[in-house]
Regions:
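Assembly/oligomerization scaffold segments
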Residues: 1-82
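A structural detector for beta-sheet-dominated domains
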Residues: 9-11, 22-24, 47-49, 77, ...
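Short beta-strands and strand-coil junctions in structured, solvent-facing domains, enriched
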Residues: 28-29, 82, 143-145, 162, ...
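Short, charged, solvent-exposed linker or helix-capping segments at domain edges/interfaces
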Residues: 33, 85-89, 165-168
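Hydrophobic residues embedded in beta-strands of well-ordered beta-sheets
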Residues: 72, 152-154
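Short acidic/polar beta-strand-loop edge motifs in secreted extracellular
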Residues: 82-103, 113-137, 141
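Short, well-structured beta-strand/strand-turn elements
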Residues: 109-116, 142-152
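Acidic, small/polar-enriched beta strand-loop surface segments
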Residues: 136, 148-150, 157-210
Length: 210
């Protein structure tokens, strides 16, 4: 087997889910000529599991191939890789975030847009940028969850979309714990939540005591 390591990074805080595939630089004393068989933009699907029971863990595209000492690293991104296309330079005035993203999605690849935000930019300049750059700017300013599902670009506030429930089991998926019993009257808890609403306003809520 020529595979050294696979690292999958999935987080709503990142614009795109990413995977690094590490291969040895040589195999049986021969250099692996990866660039002759794999190219940027090639589709990638990763399936992992046990006892030949596999499930899909990642699908996307090769974004970069690099050498790292004696290894070859293949960097991959999920479907949002398709937005790494150059856009026409332009300045959009009094444009809502949904109209902006609809314009970008249309130019990149005829994508639909499902967006919960309705605030307006006075001016939004696109210069020497890709569709991915625009998505990253919008995410950095709104903290939105942005992802592709089929031909629809989704843009939603954090926690607006609830995924599957996860069950944590000490015998199954908890590697380490440091739990301590405390009397209810002595437990102090302070929760601070910050977010951006659909109109672009920053909201901060504190609950609890320290």
């Amino acid at each position: 087997a020529a595979l050294e390591k696979v690292a999958i990074k999935c987080s709503v805080e990142n614009l795109a889910d990413k995977t690094d595939i590490t291969l040895p630089g040589t195999l049986f004393n021969r250099a692996l000529k990866v660039e002759q068989k794999i190219a940027e933009g090639d589709a990638v699907r990763i399936r992992l599991g046990y006892d030949r029971i596999l499930r899909d863990e990642f699908s996307g595209y090769v974004s970069e191939i690099a050498t790292d000492n004696d290894s070859v690293r293949i960097h991959c991104e999920d479907e949002l890789y398709k937005f790494r296309k150059d856009l026409k330079d332009r300045v959009l005035k009094s444009v809502t975030v949904k109209t902006l993203l609809t314009s970008v999605a249309e130019e990149v690849g005829k994508y639909e847009v499902a967006c919960d935000y309705d605030f307006t930019y006075d001016n939004f300049t696109i210069h020497a940028a890709t569709g991915y750059d625009v998505l990253r700017k919008v995410q950095s300013e709104t903290k939105a969850n942005i992802y592709l599902r089929g031909k629809t670009l989704h843009v939603h506030p954090q926690y607006a979309q609830i995924g599957e429930k996860v069950i944590y089991d000490f015998a199954v998926n908890i590697e380490k714990s440091d739990l301590k019993y405390r009397d209810a009257s002595k437990r102090k808890f302070l929760a601070v939540v910050e977010g951006t609403d659909a109109k672009g306003k920053t909201i901060r809520i504190e609950r609890g005591t320290t």
